Amino acid sequence: MMAKVVGLIGEDESDTDVLGTIIRKASPTRRFKFKTFHGHGKGKIIGKCNQWAKNLRDRECTALVLAQDLDEESYAKVVNELKNALEPSTIANYCIVIPVRMIEAWILSDAEAIKTALNLPSTPNDIPNPESLMDPKSKLRDLIYTLSQKRRRYMLTKDNGRIAAHLRIE
């Protein structure tokens, strides 16, 4: 079976790593190949996503995932900005993904994945609604530092992908 080539546009490499891992976990019988662009912030994604979509189409992508953290914006505003910036999309099969606050909230939803991926001595307490946290990235950083008995520092560029590999998709 040939791999489905999917374009991923996100804020940074750790976001596209997490998205690619989640896509693979959600569809374990399919093979995927990912091609990416990173905006390093919202402004660049808005300004470049249409051009990047064309580039990804030219690189044989048949599907596109465009991701932007909600941060403190309104959902409707972010969706409209991304749709207006992307359309007309040169890749017809696309979706816009907007993590509430930031993608680290998704990671915080699975305490066992955090423990396993980072080899922590204990499992963090469950966080009932991680998307309600104002700064999930800081919470994750503090949690890892504390649970590692102050031996490990959180590095989102490496740790997010490691944790995503252990996330339970239900």
For each of these PLM feature ranges, what is it?
Residues M1-V5, T16-T36, G43-A63, Q68-E170:
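C-terminal accessory helical subdomains adjacent to catalytic cores in phosphodiester-
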Residues E11-D12:
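Helix N-cap/beta->alpha junction signal
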